[in-house]
Amino acid sequence: SSYKKALTTDQKEGDITWKDGNGQGSYVVPEPKPTPTPDPKPVTPVTPAPKPVNPNPVIRGAYDTPHMRGIRSAVVGNINAWRTLADDMYRPRVLQQGEPTGIWARIGGGKYSYSGSGIDTAIDYTRIQGGYDAKTGSGWTVGGQVSYLRGNDDYVFNGSGKEKAFAVGAYGVKDLGKDQYIHLESQVGRVSNAFTARNEIGESLSGETKANAYTIGARYGKTVKFQNGTYIEPQAQLSYTHFDGDSFDAGRMHVNESGVSSTAGGLGLEIGKTFGAGNIYTRVGVNHAFSGTVNTAYTTGNTTKYTKQDLKGTWTDLAFGGRYGFNANNSIFADLSTGLSGDYKAGWSVNAGFTHKF
């Protein structure tokens, strides 16, 4: 036999045989070959190696230490002490309400707090102010004043501070006509804070930070009067404050504080009533600091850390007050105020004063 390939329309390949006599060929049907049964090999699962267990994992703490937060509280405390002392333009306000010109004094006290960026402070303070004012021929009422504030601070981990702030200033009140007015005031002074910062285990660092401060502000208002003595008075205020920088030591740590400038604005609404020789009023205000960042560097040995304290924010307040004139030359005034919201929040503050005209 022999092997041949036959190709036709349907192709088939295999063996053929033929006969020698007549040359006839026959196709030899191949024997079927069985298909082997698949025998897959089982897959052995791979067990991942266990991760090693760290019996003492490292837990990262805050970037700034409790000592740094205590020092930062003292620095911000100075700024808020100046804000409490110099930013209310109080004397121009009572002159606008009808207080006579002359020699005057005001004493009061209260609380305020500040929380933000890891610090939490509470301050009790006493404030004394006094001055003299008079009317001019140009339609302005002008005066000068001195102010003093003393406060006790509480910081995190029983840290503490003793604040002192002193300022001298000038102010003016101008009637613009049509029941409109403008108040101007400028103050310059110095603030200091003798502080002790503590950590979780009571270790303390003590020091004193001081800075010169400057403020100038303006207020515009319009009085809408009614026949029964009631009035409504919308107000708008804008002020600019600058603090000089300071460099001081707190124990083994050296601190370098940059100067800071801040611009703040406020809107208020006063509702009151005049009667005979006096008046009473209620006032609500919303204030916003548009700028201000305190940059501080803390150096211990060869290590220096830096913090930024943002002073921008909004706070609201509420006040009640009044005045009464005994005669043309002697008058008393008082007010009660509190903060409603904000990082800087005043607690209840009580103030009283008198004016004597020569």
Language model feature labels by segment:
Residues G169, F226, V255-F358:
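Outer membrane beta-barrel transmembrane domains
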